[in-house]
Amino acid sequence: MFPASTFHPCPHPYPQATKAGDGWRFGARGCRPAPPSFLPGYRQLMAAEYVDSHQRAQLMALLSRMGPRSVSSRDAAVQVNPRRDASVQCSLGRRTLQPAGCRASPDARSGSCQPRGHAGAGRSPRSWQTVAPFSSVTFCGLSSSLEVAGGRQTPTKGEGSPASSGTREPEPREVAARKAVPQPRSEEGDVQAAGQAGWEQQPPPEDRNSVAAMQSEPGSEEPCPAAEMAQDPGDSDAPRDQASPQSTEQDKERLRFQFLEQKYGYYHCKDCKIRWESAYVWCVQGTSKVYFKQFCRVCEKSYNPYRVEDITCQSCKRTRCACPVRLRHVDPKRPHRQDLCGRCKDKRLSCDSTFSFKYII
């Protein structure tokens, strides 16, 4: 608590009562609470005075909304990258933020703002307006922002004359001189661009050899000799463009998750003249493409099965056997087609488990 001897100012000072008898204690007007002892010379607020302060706060809020300047309030904003325009959603629609040169400044309230421009480029002043009728945030006119975005430099309606703002319009001679200077630069740029395009059209010798080798393979649909490729290097763009989408599709397929499922496969080794069957052939889900090859138990050569089928019962043709008389349980180490059934449901390696929790990227 504060000591009674010290004086503390109060934001709502009120004079003392005029009557001597009507002081800080109970009087004829009604029941008044006693003031605190640490604030001598000040009394507490009455109910009516609380209502007046509430009305005053409401009035201040209305004034802050109606007037262009804020009354006892602060404007909040989000800092963005000034080098890059960003679309902002406000009450009047989408607007584009201006660069750092066109921000709210004390000079903006006087009527106009001169943004920072590039070296040698004169821009007309822009009129500052409020974002909304009940907002105190100012911004450059929408028409001026659209003109700047489109490359135009025409003044807006609310602007004054260029001479009054301190800027000077370029004379016709200066405009003609500016237009005449960059013409040779554009021609040189066109020549350079044409040279780059011609260089891109002609593939390097390594690419030509690779394309010729790919097209000369026996598995290709339309073989083309390497001599024709050497004679017409410009025609190689078409096959390269056709090969690029295929490579991108293959890369996408490699990035996708491929689940594996178990199928039944027949194997045959021509060298050893051995034929065997396996019920645990890992194939890509939904296809008959074998992912893991099996090795011959004699010559230990990897072979893919010449035929792959789904693991189903031979009689009922189902993944889980529904026959009234089921065959004996299948041995995971030596699976045979006549022993495939659905009785190994809860086993570690079951015939009816088609999906694998292992996936490859």
Swiss-Prot record:
Protein's name in the database: Zygote arrest protein 1
Keyword Cytoplasm attributed: yes
Entry comment, domain topic: Disordered region at the N-terminus undergoes liquid-liquid phase separation (LLPS) for the formation of MARDO (mitochondria-associated ribonucleoprotein domain), a membraneless compartment that stores maternal mRNAs in oocytes.
Post-translational modification: Phosphorylation by CDK1 does not regulate formation of MARDO (mitochondria-associated ribonucleoprotein domain) membraneless compartment.
Stretch list, region Disordered: 1-23, 98-128, 148-252
Zinc finger (3CxxC-type): 263-346
InterPro entries for this protein: Zar1, ZAR1/RTP1-5-like_Znf-3CxxC
Phenotype reported upon loss of the gene: Mice are viable but females are infertile. Ovarian development and oogenesis through the early stages of fertilization are normal, but most embryos from mutant females arrest at the one-cell stage. Abolished formation of MARDO phase-separated membraneless compartment and mitochondrial clustering in oocytes. Mice lacking Zar1 and Zar1l oocytes display delayed meiotic resumption and polar body-1 emission and a higher incidence of abnormal meiotic spindle formation and chromosome aneuploidy.
Protein encoded by which gene: Zar1
Sites of Phosphoserine modification: S161
Compositionally biased intervals (Basic and acidic residues): 168-177
Annotated compartments: Cytoplasm, Cytoplasmic ribonucleoprotein granule; Cytoplasm
Sequence similarity: Belongs to the ZAR1 family.
Primary site of residence: cytoplasm
Outcome when changing T154A: Does not regulate formation of MARDO membraneless compartment
Impact upon substituting C341S: In 4CS mutant; abolished binding to the 3'-UTR of maternal mRNAs
GO molecular function: molecular condensate scaffold activity; mRNA 3'-UTR binding; RNA sequestering activity; zinc ion binding
Keyword Oxidoreductase belongs to the record: no
Assembly mode: Interacts with YBX2.
